[in-house]
Amino acid sequence: MEITLFDPIDAHLHVRENALLKAVLEYSSEPFSAAVIMPNLSKPLIDTPITLEYEEEILKNSSNFKPLMSLYFNDGLTLEELQRAKNKGIKFLKLYPKGMTTNAQNGTSDLLGEKTLEVLENAQKLGFILCVHAEQAGFCLDKEFLCHSVLETFALSFPKLKIIIEHLSDWRSIALIEKHDNLYATLTLHHISMTLDDLLGGSLDPHCFCKPLIKTKKDQERLLSLALKAHPKISFGSDSAPHFISKKHSANIPAGIFSAPILLPALCELFEKHNALENLQAFISDNAKKIYALDNLPSKKAHLSKKPFIVPTHTLCLNEKIAILRGGETLSWNLQEIA
């Protein structure tokens, strides 16, 4: 059995910086045509010059790959700065509630504050797409749900602003997407295939720790259903986020799952298992092209076949290991060729 996926798109990707970027970027830039690049670096991408500098670093270390750059939402994003960004081809804003995830200490503390709403108004005028890490302070399994009132306010106040709920993790968010025309979402491999049991049902597995948390069986099944039918308001976004094993095995474990090396084979395996391979093309590419109005992307054909693929346990960067999701396991699909 074989399948060819055309122009795969990752609508949510972390490729880090410097040596780590060089170590992990190829896992995404080779099989994917494009990816929405997250701006929460150690020095966040708060303006156009910094963002373009980072884009150049990505382009220098890849080929036939389009990084879709995003700005880190902040009060300094004036109308003039947003116009400057748009003129340079930047079309995404990423809003992080303060302290909710990695490098979100510079995030937005008042989500409905006057300055936040002013930036959103200007973003709507200029046709930006708003990507939201949709969590608010509260019980860990309810953080996404607790953000619903903010998302509804955004959707109603800015009806022409396209809003993406990043890495959807709570089944209760599905109704929100179906209620508002301008609300969309991305789904990760881990949220549609894993539950809290994978994280802490046996021994604690730090390599399955992410934000938002993988949740209950009900959440996983409902989200998987969206993916399997390639719901038109949903696109694939891996949220692949590498960390060194030395940090993952520390007393202060960073959130993030490095899934990039297995994405296409694992998705083929999952969709085939549920007799939905015919919908994978829409989930992995077609929906994103429509939602984000993407064109003139690098052409890619990812050829996969149903042959065993033993997942490496890790990759290396500066003699440090980075654990790969499902490392040591054998997947039933293998990425054979990229053309």
Swiss-Prot record:
Keyword set, alphabetical order: Hydrolase, Metal-binding, Pyrimidine biosynthesis, Zinc
EC number, as in UniProt: 3.5.2.3
Transmembrane segments: none
Class of the enzyme per the UniProt entry, highest EC level: hydrolase
Binding residues for substrate: H14, V15, R16, N40, H133, H243, A255
Residues that coordinate or bind Zn(2+) 1: H12, H14, K94, D239
Keyword Cytoplasm in annotation: no
Purpose: Catalyzes the reversible cyclization of carbamoyl aspartate to dihydroorotate.
NCBIfam families registered for this protein in UniProt: pyrC_dimer
Assembly information from the UniProt record: Homodimer.
The protein's name in its UniProt record: Dihydroorotase
Organism: Helicobacter pylori (strain J99 / ATCC 700824)
Name of the gene this protein is made from: pyrC
